[in-house]
Design a protein with these regions (language model features):
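Hydrophobic alpha-helical segments and their helix-loop junctions in multi-pass secondary transporters
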Residues: 151, 167-192, 207-211, 251-258, ...
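Selective recognition of specific alpha-helical transmembrane segments in multi-pass small-molecule
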Residues: 35-38, 61-69, 104-115, 168-179, ...
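Juxtamembrane transmembrane-helix boundary signature
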Residues: 59-92, 99-113, 427, 434
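C-terminal membrane-solvent junction of multi-pass transporters and transport-like membrane proteins
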Residues: 16, 355-428, 432, 436
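Membrane-interface "cap" regions at the ends of multi-pass membrane proteins
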Residues: 1-53, 198-204, 222-232, 433-435
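Transmembrane alpha-helical segments of multi-pass small-molecule transport proteins
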Residues: 101, 128-153, 167-178, 203-217, ...
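Membrane-water interface regions at transmembrane-helix termini and the short interhelical loops
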Residues: 47-48, 75, 99, 121-130, ...
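Hydrophobic transmembrane alpha-helices that form the core helical bundles
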Residues: 97-131, 290-307
């Protein structure tokens, strides 16, 4: 079991404990994407008006753009021995790291709920196939309890789940995918030309699918020896992210014709129909897939809550996160598709500038060990200003659409602007201070 104290999050991992095998980097970036989320995302592209070819292009471009910052962030863990939020205090300061850490905690709670809705739906169907019945709240509670226990035990148990449960899920979903494709007809051409605004919006959803892991990345590389090759870490992380997200989303494209709507209920019904008498295998895989993803969410959320300034034992943070995720999932179960797309897009508006600053500081700043700034730094101000302006001007969702997004016909470029503006602003300021 990982150390339960708040200090284990705020302080670097001792060198004696940095013994994690390097292959875990691949599994920790591969397994959390194994689930109906990627499938739903691929099917969602068809409902947005993309055909198969433009959908594949959006999937490849969006996932590569989203995965690169995550992979580069993963290499920060071994040298610092810190979680991703704690590592960002170099640029933001001890006080300045609290807003993004708190946002990340809320973000993890939301993903907890989003992931558990299809898993609980699958578990209910699985129980019905076995002659049992359970209400949604009970099925959800069973899954949330298992995920919470994994996060209570911490990093090492979470990593084991990613490797061994992830390998099992990979084989199962490959079989499901093959069966689904044999029962489906791909939408090879669109009934009307795909507008560039629609393509940008679709690409943005796909960028966020991978970029959303940026705030987790070094959480699961900090137990590697400090001497581990950064190039190897980046390569393994990139392979894991792209190797799971791209195939699953393309499967969603290929099987969209057999899915009534881009929702977990429709995906599950399609799986059951295609798999026939062994449909329970598909149901079990979907239910189990939430454990790989949400053990990540709950564990990282417990880290983030401590980084946000609530210095409670890690177990208390994990229990609080899982409990709130459960409540949100019960409350929002009937609005999955809209919640899913809005959540993917809205979270980008703070993650993009934050990770832009973190990467600019690490790769272009001075890595000489220095005391962590105790208060609010220039980097924290850049993060706050860029995030607010990005949301106010560029955001596109059912919640709010900014004036620039309206002028562009609904195209969403806010995350690109936020990332590059924050990174350049921070890097240029750091260079001018160094030269002076």
């Amino acid at each position: 079991m990982e150390d339960l104290s708040a200090a284990s999050v705020r302080e670097p991992v001792p060198a004696a404990l940095k013994t994690m095998p390097t292959d875990r980097v691949f599994w920790s970036h591969f397994s959390p994407n194994l689930g109906p989320g990627g499938w739903v995302t691929g099917a969602l592209l068809i409902s947005m008006g993309l055909d198969f070819y433009t959908g594949v292009l959006a999937i490849i471009v969006g996932n590569i753009i989203g995965a690169l910052p995550v992979a580069f962030a993963a290499s920060i863990g071994p040298e610092t021995g810190l979680t991703q939020m704690e590592a960002s205090r170099r640029a933001l300061g001890r006080l300045g790291v609290r807003p993004p850490a708190f946002l990340n905690w809320i973000y993890c709670v939301g993903w907890d709920a989003v992931n558990n809705v299809p898993a609980a739906t699958a578990l209910i169907a699985l129980l019905l196939a076995c002659g049992l019945s359970a209400p949604f709240w009970l099925a959800l509670g069973l899954l949330a309890a298992v995920q919470m226990m994994a996060s209570v035990y911490g990093h090492h148990v979470v990593q084991l789940l990613q490797k061994y449960l992830g390998a099992l899920l990979l084989v199962t979903f490959l079989v499901i995918g093959g069966v689904q494709i044999s029962h489906s007809t791909a939408h090879l051409t669109a009934t009307h030309p795909v507008s560039w605004q629609t393509f940008l919006l679709a690409t943005g959803i796909l960028v966020s699918f991978n970029l959303s892991w940026a705030s987790y990345s070094s959480d699961y590389t900090r137990y590697l020896p400090a001497s581990t090759s950064p190039t190897k870490i980046i390569g393994l992380a990139l392979t894991g992210l792209l190797g799971s997200a791209i195939p699953f989303q393309i499967l969603g494209l290929l099987t969209a014709s057999s899915i009534a709507e881009p929702s977990p209920t429709a995906v599950i019904a399609s799986f059951q129909h295609a798999m026939g008498p062994v449909g329970i295998v598909a149901l079990a895989a979907i239910a189990l897939s939430s454990i790989t993803g949400n053990s990540f969410n709950d564990n990282t959320a417990s880290y983030s809550l401590i980084s946000a300034g609530l210095h409670v034992p890690r177990i208390a943070a994990a229990v609080l996160t899982a409990s709130l995720g459960y409540v949100l999932a019960v409350a929002g179960a009937g609005q999955y598709a809209s919640l899913y797309t809005d959540y993917l897009l809205v979270t980008m508006y703070w993650i993009a500038p934050w990770i832009g600053i973190v990467l600019a500081d690490w790769y272009f700043g001075d890595r000489t060990p220095k005391p962590v700034p105790p208060g609010w730094t220039r980097g924290a101000t850049i993060f706050t200003v860029t995030s607010v302006l990005t949301i106010g001007l560029f955001s596109t969702s059912t919640i709010y659409t900014g004036p620039v997004a309206r002028w562009l016909g609904g195209a969403d470029i806010g995350y690109y602007i936020g990332f590059f503006v924050a990174a350049l602003w921070y890097a240029l300021g750091a260079r001018s201070r160094t030269s002076s």
